[in-house]
Amino acid sequence: ERLPVMLYPDEPFDCHGVYSGSALVEDGMLYLYYTGNVKHPGEYDYIKQGRGHNVCLATSRDAIHLDNKRCLMYNQDYPAGLTCHVRDPKVFALDGRYYMVLGARTLDDHGEVLVFESADKLHWNHINTITTPKAFGYMWECPDLFELDGQWFLAVSPQGIACQNVYGCGYFALQGDWRTDCTLSEFHALDDGFDYYAPQSFAAADGRRIQFGWMGMPDADYTNPTVEYGWQHCLTLPRVLTQDGNGCLLQAPAAELNALRGEARQPAD
């Protein structure tokens, strides 16, 4: 069913784009956390100056009509030493509190993830920063922090690393408490293909951890045929994540995809 556009960049805090984020569902209310992009007029590089990357929140009861829309954090609310590139809030609940991870780029081009905590989903405090001892890319986009059988994982899409595909994405296994102090394992790629980026996961009602990726290739030299209809790009097929007990993720197609299968065909000799 084709539904109307729900989120428009129609406020001063998101006037140049509703950028990616995440959703939280509680008590029949949908909380949509996203990045509000603002490009201030002037002679700026829009990396270290001139850009607002705001954490915004929209709420809805039916996922069609908005009840409220507000800005929760502006550039000045982030830790010192960062560029204007802070984005992609992923929010989840744990032990009666709420947590948010944000991708960030430092002034010396070091990718990292900011961890925030909240008691009410509205007011957020920075409690930790997760990164590598040496720079691993200049920006970590679309972070996702999740736990599988007692092991925590941090998935990121780092910009500025050498990889065989166009857009690299992968994950670290975490040792320690990510709320206070932790170290990261070796980085593992999530996909060896060329069109899988910015993956995000959620916990299904039956406990499975399901992940979708972005099938986009925005800088490719081909044009998607759907552009003339006002949209482009897709989400990938859902994958169920498990772990092998040694800090590595395993991926399998979601069982629901079986219902889409048709009659099997054998290749001709």
Question: Which positions does each model-derived feature cover?
Answer:
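Repeated scaffold domains used in trafficking and secretory/extracellular systems
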Residues: 138-143, 197-199
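Beta-rich carbohydrate-recognition and catalytic domains
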Residues: 1-88, 93-137, 147-192, 215-268
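Catalytic and ligand-binding motifs that coordinate phosphates/metal ions
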Residues: 193-197, 202-203
